[in-house]
Amino acid sequence: MSQLLSVTRGLYSMPPAHGSAIVDIILHNSELTRQWQEELGQMRQRIHNLRADLVNVLNQQQDERDFSFIAHERGMFSFLGLSVEQVHRLKNEFSIYMTDTSRISVAGLTVERMDYVSQAIVKVLRP
């Protein structure tokens, strides 16, 4: 057990340098920095588009609840404002996973699955 603790402590006290070494290489090479910034911009735009698509599809499928706040947020996640019971129904009935606080990974959505996810959300909103 003491050997395991020793190894574990070493990992936490001295985290691997791989990540920082990669960042160092990218930021000290102008071509790699440009490529990284371009890819980052593409991912930012993808998430922005997914947010807009989610709002549009949800609004087309129901009109009881305003989901426009999703389009105005930033980042990879969004809180949907669902109850714990509704979140559990999404998980158990539709295999859609999120935290119990209804925080969904927008970055994890795809255009192909948008209708399915939206329809499931609408179904759990209705009694």
Describe each region flagged by the PLM.
Residues 1-37:
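Conserved core segment of the aminotransferase class I/II
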Residues 7-8, 39, 75, 102, ...:
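Residue-level detector of alpha-helix boundaries and kinks
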Residues 10, 32-33, 64, 96-97, ...:
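A general structural signal for well-ordered secondary-structure junctions
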Residues 11, 15, 42, 46, ...:
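Catalytic cores of large soluble enzymes that bind and process phosphate-bearing ligands
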Residues 27, 56-60, 82-127:
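PLP-dependent enzyme catalytic core of the Aspartate aminotransferase-like
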Residues 32-93:
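Conserved PLP-binding catalytic core of the aspartate aminotransferase-like
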